[in-house]
Amino acid sequence: MKFKNIIPTIILLISASLQAQEPNDTISYSVNARINAGSGAYAPFLSTANQFDRYSFAPNSLSLWGTIHKEIKKARSLDYGFGVELDGNIAKNEKRFFPAELYAQGKIYFMNLNVGSKREVFGNQDAELSSGGMLWSQNSRPMPKISIETNGYIDVPYTKGYLAVKGGLSHGWFNDNIGIENLLLHYKYAYIKVGGSFPVNINYGIQHVAQWGGVSSQYGSMPVTWDNYYRIFLGKSGSSTATQSDQINTLGNHIISQNLGIDLNLKSLIVSLYWQNLTEDPPVRFISRTPNIGDGLWGLSVRLPTFKPFYAFVLEYMSTTAQSGPWHDLDGVIYGGADGYYYNGQIPGNWSYRGMTIGNPWLSSPKYNLDGSSSITNNLVKLYYFSGKGEFKSINYKLTLAYSENFGFASPGTGSNPSYENFKKQVSYQLETSTPLRFLKNTQVSLAISGDKGAMYSNNLALILGISYKGLFGY
């Protein structure tokens, strides 16, 4: 299906669903503005990372956006939803206006069908405070795709709720056309959760993405056929018509992430421990037996529902420096090595979308490349990260602190990595506050201070002012 056919599909899906619904649905909307007033080469890192590419990288900018959403109700067996967000940025050398979200979704019992560009969070990391998942974060804007998935976890029959599963399958389009026209996305995930009503639950999941198809200026056409889709789905090598690299390895660019987590849920304390890894090369082993076991994201998430002054925080450590060792070989003795996370030599944009890293944003987005290249050039990183939030009277706050060591770039097949003695240190910090305006109903103002200090993103400092109006109407 071409993306131009998605809009009629959205209209048909909404129209059909409207006829099946009872009245008293609600639609939420918002109108927002934000001013970034700063000094330095960029807007501070934390002011743009994990924001779905909503804001400009310029140190001084104005951002405007409006949203309309109708959410699916879990209590209904049949329901529909949709969302639209229009964003705009104005800076000294930049003016951009774009649809950040445009989607429709339908629900039939425990299954959802999503069509379009929808902001989503994939993985078992903390959805609000994390630095970002290893495979998917909230850093890039969503690409258009068609997805079918369960509506969250569903109980397995005859297990009395102690065993639950969730999963999904997506087909998407990289319509930024960076070096390859009509590049496609394949994504699927499956999770299992054990524990049910017990206070301790264990979850394990696996995610698989592949970039494939399209027409490359360097490698020519990469045909979109059912045979190739079968090879992509199962991670098999390419046929005789594929490039030599895809015949030796797997067809397309594949990345797998395994997630393992433990959750403790008490009345006044909710704790989650999570571990995520990446696999770029075969064989795929269980998360605790991979050759790059030193790499991944480890997180602790704590919720204190009854303690408003400090009711949530996250501590995370991430490393991508092991990369299974320096050697990338397929001689039957040594597998993997020089993994080159997010990098693929045949796909100029690598694992990014519209210049923004799709995975963890500390593997720097191509927008930071001074030479204008479209590749990810900093994928050897160690990150120490904290984020917490709370409420004092009517003022909400969120504090984020991050320290990173950036070692540069490792690509597959080089047999060597950059020197681990020479790296760029970076400290990033941000304090955000917000409060409702008493004299203007449904309106909230925000004030933040954000900054960077170090050699990776230079020294940046900004004061960020925002205002937001939110409303609801029923029908």
Q: Language model features by range: what are they?
A:
Residues 41-48, 93-97, 125-132, 176-185, ...:
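Outer-membrane beta-barrel translocator domains and adjoining extracellular loop/strand segments
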Residues 196, 200-263:
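A conserved mid-domain beta-alpha-beta active-site/ligand-binding segment of alpha/beta enzyme cores
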Residues 121-221:
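Internal, well-ordered domain-core segments that constitute the primary functional module
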Residues 33-41, 86-92, 108-110, 117-123, ...:
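Transmembrane beta-strands of outer-membrane beta-barrel pores
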Residues 246-257, 265-475:
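Outer-membrane beta-barrel pore domains
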Residues 20-120, 127, 136, 142-154, ...:
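Beta-barrel outer-membrane channel/assembly domains of diderm bacteria
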Residues 1-25, 468, 473-475:
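Bacterial Sec-dependent N-terminal signal peptides
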Residues 21-28, 69-81, 94, 107-111, ...:
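Short loop/turn motifs that connect adjacent beta-strands in outer-membrane beta-barrel proteins
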